[in-house]
């Protein structure tokens, strides 16, 4: 079972919180969860034992390893859009309970490295409800698979994500 929610702004409060689910059938018992300002993660997919970012080129073609139908490797100098969630507050803030549309930059800066090279996203923020987007130019890297590392306020995404690059 899975429940996807938009958590309300807890005004900086972090730590244990009680979650109660209410619907037409009634209400659940309280579940304990941990609130944090950010718990970042990229959306990913697994293929042949490797984890790739759910990323696209500007023409919406999915980025992935070579020789896989329907996907293409990233190229050095190319702008790639990465997607994730949990990267924290934006400015302007998102109104709780309202559907968001538009673009809102993150309040705090994201640190990102691809293949060990620091990159600065041209945009890092919310692009729709619950969806963070990062527009990043791929650095000058050799052909191959390169680690993707990201963090915000010293909280890192899970390790093991690689992006395929081919000149």
Where are the regions that the model predicts?
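A sequence-level detector for low-complexity, Ser/Thr- and acidic-rich stretches
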Residues: 1-167
